[in-house]
């Protein structure tokens, strides 16, 4: 009997440790400067995945991809959304179409299309590019979304989307962006709520950063998602 009880206790401890490891692996940083929203940067390896919850009413995903973690949607994105009680994404914002930003997004759209998840996705938001004929990933995401019944929106600098008291201002790309240089033409978002400002920079390089500075678009912010995962070729000192 003692062996059996010890075995049960030990098994419970193992499960608890495993659950803790899974939670740590999924969530890298949780940032909540105000009660009306929460920003979670997920540990997706070499890639990006950010979930923003707003006023307990709206949830959005900003990018979701990785080049070194397989089945990101199944093993990281969906489990995290479930752990937060999120059954609907009001928007998935794709900054650009490199694999390390879209692999998990593609999976989520496929799951919705095949009715393999209860998650609902309302909108897929892409940068407005004039030349997408050679961009297979862009066309694939658009087609998947349409097949899954997800509305596709394209945005450019000057556009703005509101979720209650939170505003998402599109700072980039310019209306003339072709999309041939996916990094430099990536979507840049500024999130504004009361006295808070956050900046999501995709993978823009220093050339685009300099243009945004010259245009007076880059101001002091409380939260910065560095471009190119913190690469020395992006997010300059200014």
Where do the PLM segments sit?
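Non-globular, low-confidence helical/coil segments that flank catalytic cores
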Residues: 1-238
């Amino acid at each position: 009997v003692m062996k059996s009880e010890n075995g049960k206790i030990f098994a419970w401890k193992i499960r608890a440790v495993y659950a803790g490891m899974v939670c740590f692996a999924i969530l890298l940083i949780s940032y909540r400067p105000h009660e009306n929203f929460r920003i979670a940067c997920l540990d997706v390896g070499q890639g990006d995945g950010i979930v923003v919850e707003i006023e307990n009413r709206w949830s959005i995903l900003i990018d979701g991809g990785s080049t070194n973690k397989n089945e990101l949607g199944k093993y990281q994105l969906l489990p995290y959304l479930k752990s937060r009680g999120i059954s609907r994404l009001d928007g998935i914002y794709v900054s650009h179409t490199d694999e390390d930003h879209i692999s998990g997004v593609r999976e989520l759209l496929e799951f919705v299309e095949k009715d393999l998840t209860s998650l609902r996705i309302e909108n897929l938001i892409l940068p407005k590019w004039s030349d997408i004929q050679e961009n297979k990933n862009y066309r694939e995401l658009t087609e998947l979304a349409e097949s899954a019944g997800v509305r596709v929106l394209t945005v450019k600098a000057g556009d703005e989307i509101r979720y209650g008291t939170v505003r998402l201002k599109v700072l980039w790309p310019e209306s003339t962006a072709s999309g041939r240089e996916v990094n430099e033409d990536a979507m840049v978002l500024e999130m504004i709520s009361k006295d808070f400002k956050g900046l999501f920079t995709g993978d823009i390089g220093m050339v685009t950063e300099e243009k945004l500075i010259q245009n007076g678009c880059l101001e002091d912010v409380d939260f910065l998602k560095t471009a190119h995962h913190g690469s020395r070729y992006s997010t300059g000192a200014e």
